Curated annotation (Swiss-Prot):
The gene is RACC. This is Rho-related protein racC. Transmembrane segments: none annotated. The keyword Cytoplasm applies. GO terms for molecular function: GTP binding; GTPase activity; metal ion binding; protein kinase binding.
Length: 194
């Protein structure tokens, strides 16, 4: 008899347009979506194997826009892990991890592990983006600042990735599954022989 798959609920939060939906779509169907469509709520389920365990990874996408602040926390129930995302080319989204996303997550799910994700890694060295940021008196977020933020919010990991190029994309989800499995007791059969 085969074991029931382990269910993991992964919830992704962060500002609108930081790449949360692209992260999930690129991972789940291995194709980067070229069009931006703001999310209200979406879920995807990915079946995978971790060692000998079958995993049902439920990916919950959330809307980052302010008008969904009252609705979004409804998706936090029974979360196994959170990905708090910011764009490495947006200091506003980086700052909002501290002022909005981390406080919201720990308010509704204080014991659930968090992985901090720096998205849009492929744009960090884009000359046009760097020039635009410089003209606005801003800079890209480097890895050291990401690690500093990880420590500040006590996230278990900080990972930078690109949904567009797939750089470190699989790593984000592998680390999320690994984190949950390390903290989740092995389910045992409820059958006993006397």
């Amino acid at each position: 008899m085969s074991e029931k798959p382990t269910s993991i609920k992964l919830v992704v939060v962060g500002d609108g347009a930081v790449g949360k939906t692209c992260l999930l779509i690129s991972y789940s169907i291995r194709k980067f979506p070229e069009d931006y469509i703001p999310t209200v709520f979406d879920n995807y389920v990915v079946s995978l194997t971790a060692g000998t365990r079958q995993i049902q990874l439920a990916l919950w996408d959330t809307a980052g826009q302010e008008e969904y602040d009252q609705l979004r926390p409804l998706s936090y129930s029974s979360a196994s892990i959170f990905l708090i995302c910011f764009s490495v080319t947006s200091s506003v989204s980086y700052d909002n991890v501290i002022t909005k996303w981390h406080p919201e997550v720990i308010h509704f799910a204080p014991k659930v592990p968090i992985i901090l994700v720096g998205t849009k890694l492929d744009t960090r060295n884009d000359p046009a983006i760097v020039k635009r940021l410089t003209e606005q008196g801003m800079t890209v977020i480097n890895t050291a600042k990401g690690e500093e933020l990880k420590n500040r919010i006590k996230a278990v990991k900080y990972i930078e990735c690109s949904a567009k190029t797939s750089e470190n994309l699989k790593t984000v989800f592998d680390e999320a599954v690994k984190t949950v499995l390390m903290n989740k007791p092995q389910q045992r059969s409820k059958c006993a022989l006397l």
